[in-house]
Structures are given as C-alpha cells and as structure tokens.
C-alpha cells in the first residue's frame, strides 16, 4: 500500500495539520502502542544484556530462567535518566540534566543519580502526594477533613518523608496519636475514615498497614480487630470544625468485645491502657507477618507497576506472591535497615531488574508478572500537567469545589505539591487523579482514554500553552536550525538526543516552512508532546 495514503488517512482521523504530519508520525511511531522499534540498539535500550548485581536480580533472573523467559536488555542512559526522575521525584529532567547524565563517563553515574534524587526536595513532594492518596488527605466531601486540617496533615506527611522517618514510627504515630485535628496532624488518620465505627476503622487500618481487605474476613476475625479501636473517641471544640481524637475508655460498648490480633491471639489489656498502642506495638514488631510485607510489596509496585503480590492492597492466602523469595528478601532488608524506606528504594532502583528496557524479548504471558522488562505506564495526572507546564513555561489554576480562604493556591505551585485532594482541575480529573475517598490503589486511574487523547490533540488548553512556549520561541528566534538547537529541543522534551533520522525530519520540516514560521514550531512541539514516548514512563 502507498505509504502516502496511509499517512493521509492517519492525518484525517487525528485532525493533524498536513505540514506537521511527518513530524507527528516520526514522534508517535517511536513508542506507539508500547512497541519501540526492534533494532539492535534503539533510543530505548542498550545492547547490554543484564547481569545480576545483587540478591534482587539473582531471585528475579532465577525465576525467569525457570520459566524460560529471557529478560530485556538494559535500558539506555537516556531512558534511565528520564525514568529515574519520573519514578523518584515525579518530575522530568531538564535538558541540561539529561545531557550531562547521558554524556557523563562516570561508570557509577546511575548509582550517583539515584542517591542525588533521593535527597531532592521533590522526593518529599512526590511521595507526599502518593501517601496523600492512601491516607485520604482531602478537605471536602466525603472525607471532610476541612482545609486547615488537610494542609496540616499533608505538611506532617511531607515532613516525615523529607526527614526519612522510619516507617514503623510513621505508622505508630498515625495509629496512636491523640489531640486536635488542627494541631496534632496524624490524628487526621482517624478523621479521614468515612465509617468511624470500630469495624470501619479496622478495615481502614488493615488496608493501609497490612495490605488486606478486612471486609472479606470472617465476622469474628474482623470483630476482634475492631475491638482495638472501640475506645477511639471524638469531640468538638469551640473552634469551627476542630475535633479532638482521644482514648475514651468510657465510650458505650467500649469493652463489649475482646481485642484479638489477626493471628488469632487474644490481647491482654489493663483497664486504663489504650488498645491502639497495644495493636501498634504488635503491628510493627519484626515478627509480624503483615507489616513489612505490605510496605515492601507496595514500594515494589510503585516503582515497577505491579506488586510481587498483585494487587498490592489485596494480600490474602489465595493471592500468592509471584516470587515469594523476592518478597521475603525485601522484607528482610527493610527490617534489618530499621524500616528505612530510602534503603528499600535504593536497593530496587539500583537493581538490574529495575533498569531493564521496556522492550520485551518475548511474548510469554508470565513475563509481566515476573518483571522481565520495565512496564510501560502513562504518567500520573499531576506529573503530566507539571511536565507540560515546565516544558512550555506556563502555569495552571487549581481550585476547590467549595472554596475556602485556606485553599488559595498560587499558580506557580506544581500539581505534585497540592496539599488537598479537594483542590483540583478539569485536567487532573480527566487524567485519573485519585479521588482519595477509599485509600485503594485502584482509585488512581492511569489508563488512557479517548477523551484524554482528544484533549491533547485538539484542546485550546494545550494550544494556549504551546503558543506561550519557551521552546517555540527558541525555535523561531534561532538564526539557524542547527543540530545543537534540535538536540536541545529533544533533550528538553524527551530527555534524549534525536536520532539522525529524527534530526533530518525536524530540520526539513522547519526549513521547509521557514525556520521563523511560528506555526511550524508550535506543530513540532505539539507532535512530540502527543507522542507516547512523552506521555509514558518507559
């Protein structure tokens, strides 16, 4: 079939301006449908086969070998720098950051980059956003924390992450704190639970800290766990929307049920002892079968799309791990590191398993569950709009459905920094931002939709950003479309140097239209921002 007919048909279906079609097709086909070109070495992979660099790799590769699945090659440096920035700090690298990393001759540059990113301020911003989903940090309906409580809660979460607070301490403070929801931020863990009956609290605790959906448990097992939270009291104060969370041993029916740990062992409590503290001590004990397993599995899923137990918040006996030895290894590492989550991040990020290319070496159905290649996944809504704003030099307006004095957000604030799930935008809603109503991982939806594609292809929202773009100004103000200008453009948008073919296409399109033709520059930027390579983690 004549390729010109195929291309013209594609233009018609997508509404692509004809003079931009060559650029768009070149950009789109690089990673279209998650299938990069299968050449010996592409922009997405190196020519190097992986070799086990530690215990994680030994366990993953041994399982793949038993399944006769060949792992992907290692990813290229260009892919790694973009992947690491997105996965660790939820931010795309600048063109200069990408260029310096790619050109560096330091044999340990990947390890050095990981260490650097784990100490960046954006690490706390991004992971506070992720924990905000799980802990339901939301001011308005149906969580109703109220704006100043939501912001205090978010600040405490962010400060805990920034200070690398041990995860067992983080969990214990959430479970045992008492006081004002405005002045003792972790008590908002209880305030953010919709069903504040003991059974409702128990289900949320099990989901958050054990990765278990306790509503599926036998009634007597759930009742035993709920008894630990039967004395959680709440009372209002004279300050509007302030609430005090406290241990209330006189609460009606507080001692009607006997607290029983999920292991089936009955707890021994004194009359004046807060059962929450007894449960928290049991939960974070290194011998506990759920606590370390839950967070180790979640961290793995956050970095590699799926848990070793999948889904990561549905741990149960009939949902076994795909690699039990691997999960046990991560649990052991976390416990011996005294629940230092950065230690866990560092181990996973430095593994060859994490650094595999997104280009699979086969099509066996078991490959994905056993981590034979890096999974393709669309950027989080917040990460995507921040990337668009950064690349175009524009800002975004975020508002709450019920405006309050506390919810004014300056336009320069990035989406990953938003402290409250009630503060949003139509873009964030369209692109699947978590509702923060249940704490389930599935609330966040990164699956692409037709509405999203149409928005990126045809919306005035993106068009306005492109018209104001610094990149467009650079392309139109350059006296000559030199290789350096094209290199800088690709490094800024895709965090890599263009291939020779891409450089020729871009040069011909711009020179063919006149290199000062603003519309051609806008179209070029638009084409790359609509490419799967830009929109997906890879």
Where in this protein do the model-derived segments appear?
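Penicillin-binding protein/beta-lactamase superfamily catalytic region
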Residues: 269
């Amino acid at each position: 079939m004549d390729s010109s007919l195929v291309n013209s048909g594609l233009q018609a279906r997508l509404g692509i301006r004809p003079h931009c079609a060559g650029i768009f097709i070149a950009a789109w086909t690089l990673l279209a449908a998650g299938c990069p070109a299968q050449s010996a070495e592409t922009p997405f992979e190196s020519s190097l086969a992986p070799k086990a660099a530690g215990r994680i790799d030994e366990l993953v590769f041994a399982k793949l070998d038993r399944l006769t699945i060949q792992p992907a090659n290692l990813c290229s440096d260009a892919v790694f720098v973009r992947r690491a920035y997105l996965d660790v700090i939820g931010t795309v690298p600048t063109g200069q950051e990408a260029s310096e990393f790619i050109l560096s001759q330091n044999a340990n540059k990947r390890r050095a980059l990981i260490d650097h990113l784990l100490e960046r301020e954006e690490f706390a911003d991004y992971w506070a956003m992720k924990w905000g989903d799980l802990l339901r940090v939301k001011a308005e309906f149906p969580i109703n924390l109220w704006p100043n409580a939501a912001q205090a809660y978010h600040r405490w979460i962010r400060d805990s992450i920034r200070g690398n607070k041990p995860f067992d301490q983080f969990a214990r403070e959430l479970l045992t704190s008492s006081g004002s929801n405005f002045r003792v931020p972790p008590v908002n863990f209880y305030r953010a639970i919709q069903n504040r009956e003991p059974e409702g609290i128990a289900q949320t605790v099990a989901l958050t800290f054990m990765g278990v959906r306790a509503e599926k448990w036998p009634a007597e097992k759930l009742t035993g766990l709920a008894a630990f939270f039967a004395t959680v009291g709440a009372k209002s104060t004279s300050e509007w929307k302030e609430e005090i969370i406290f241990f209330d041993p006189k609460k009606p029916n507080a001692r009607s049920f006997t607290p029983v740990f999920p292991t089936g062992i009955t707890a021994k409590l004194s009359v004046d002892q807060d059962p929450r503290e007894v449960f928290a001590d049991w939960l974070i004990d290194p011998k506990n079968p759920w606590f370390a397993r839950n967070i180790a599995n979640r961290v793995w899923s956050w970095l590699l799309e799926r848990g070793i137990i999948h889904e990561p918040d549905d741990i149960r006996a009939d949902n076994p791990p795909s690699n039990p030895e691997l999960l046990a290894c991560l649990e052991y590492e976390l416990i011996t590191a005294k629940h230092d989550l950065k230690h866990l991040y560092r181990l996973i990020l430095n593994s060859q398993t994490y650094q595999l290319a997104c280009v699979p070496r086969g099509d066996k159905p078991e490959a994905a569950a056993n981590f034979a290649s890096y999974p393709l996944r669309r950027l989080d809504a917040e990460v995507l709009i921040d990337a668009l704003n950064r690349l175009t030099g524009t800002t975004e307006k975020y508002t709450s459905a019920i405006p309050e004095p506390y919810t004014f957000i300056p336009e320069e604030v990035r989406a990953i920094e938003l402290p409250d799930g009630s503060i949003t935008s139509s873009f964030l809603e369209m692109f699947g931002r978590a509702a923060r109503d249940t704490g389930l991982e599935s609330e966040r939806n990164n699956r692409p939709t037709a509405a999203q594609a149409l928005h990126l292809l045809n919306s005035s929202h993106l068009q306005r950003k492109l018209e104001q773009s610094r990149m467009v100004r650079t392309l139109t103000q350059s006296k000559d479309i030199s290789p350096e200008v094209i290199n800088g453009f690709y490094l800024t948008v895709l965090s890599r140097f263009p291939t020779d073919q891409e450089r020729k296409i871009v040069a011909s399109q711009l020179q063919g239209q006149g290199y000062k033709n603003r519309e051609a520059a806008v179209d070029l930027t638009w084409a790359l921002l609509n490419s799967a390579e830009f929109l997906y983690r890879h």
